[in-house]
């Protein structure tokens, strides 16, 4: 194991920005209040803070425009000055699936043992838990499993599920699997953990979380019942829900890294109710909804604008 410096995403951002700031990642201290048992990293709570979304009066893009150091920091953390999406790595699926196994088979269990919650979040360079217990966080950055407990941080390259569980101080099991989740398999098998795929997933989850947090601002109806962005480990995708279930408007808005029906990442809107398949928006036969492919995002002059248009169209159709 190697030692690392403890992270506090919001404090790091505020030190760089020189003012109150919001981020896309969890920060300590541990939140023990229901229902989320987690912080909301973008919530302004009435404060005039620099924001990764258009909800505030100042964005990270505003600051990045005149300060190269801020621009570099914002880009690394998907807060602003956004870089182009990378190409999908060769032989992506096998390695992606093993990162998925780590997420649902190990990391989610560490959080669940502390407070009964198993939702994960985007963290810089990968994914991990919100803070729990005594300011603890378990996360993956690139190919490394990182365990932070207070000011103590250890890191180790991912090798097997059994070893990952040992380092994280938890058990490896399939308790968080969904009906379509890949099987966990042999806990002692050498995982296909690759640097290029780890970096790619970190970028995808950063991009996905950033466009989803912006899409949450679409919720304007009084009964939209907006949830937070979190990663369901069984599906391995950042997502949130909004819209009235009773009125047939509720849907999940998400950013999948790919699954059994999709080799590459995609954005999606999955309706909780009936949809009219004659509307070309509802184009995905893999689930009850519509998707926007990674190829379409790569081909776009402005992938972020295309993503927002896709989510907006879904919201408008459901609320028509």
Feature-to-residue mapping (PLM):
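Long, compositionally biased interface segments
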Residues: 276-320
């Amino acid at each position: 194991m190697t030692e690392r410096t403890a992270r506090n995403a919001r404090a790091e951002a505020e030190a760089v920005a020189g003012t109150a700031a919001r981020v896309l990642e969890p920060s300590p201290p541990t939140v023990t209040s229901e229902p989320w048992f987690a912080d909301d990293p973008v919530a302004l709570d009435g404060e005039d803070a620099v924001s990764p979304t258009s909800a505030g009066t100042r964005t990270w893009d505003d600051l990045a425009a005149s300060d190269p150091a801020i621009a570099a920091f914002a880009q690394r953390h998907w807060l602003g000055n956004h870089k182009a999406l990378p190409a999908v790595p060769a032989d992506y699926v096998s390695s992606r699936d093993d990162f998925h196994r780590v997420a649902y088979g190990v990391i989610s269990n560490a959080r669940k043992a502390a407070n009964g919650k198993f939702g994960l979040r985007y963290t810089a360079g990968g994914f991990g838990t919100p803070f729990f217990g005594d300011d603890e966080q378990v996360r993956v950055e690139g190919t490394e499993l990182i365990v932070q407990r207070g000011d103590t941080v250890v890191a180790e390259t991912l090798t097997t599920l059994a070893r990952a569980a040992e380092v994280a101080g938890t058990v490896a099991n399939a308790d968080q699997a969904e009906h379509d989740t890949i099987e966990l398999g042999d806990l002692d098998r050498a995982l296909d953990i690759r640097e290029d795929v780890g970096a790619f997933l970190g970028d995808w989850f950063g991009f996905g979380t950033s466009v989803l947090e912006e899409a949450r601002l679409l919720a304007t109806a009084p009964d939209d019942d907006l949830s937070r962005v979190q990663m369901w480990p069984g599906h391995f995708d950042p997502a949130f829900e909004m819209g009235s279930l009773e009125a047939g408007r509720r849907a999940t808005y998400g950013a999948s890294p790919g699954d059994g029906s999709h080799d590459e990442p995609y954005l999606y809107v999955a309706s909780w109710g009936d949809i009219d398949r004659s509307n070309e928006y509802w184009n995905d036969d893999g689930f009850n909804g519509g998707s926007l492919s990674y190829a379409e995002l790569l081909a776009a002059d402005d992938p972020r604008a295309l993503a927002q248009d896709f989510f907006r169209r879904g919201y408008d159709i459901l609320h028509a």
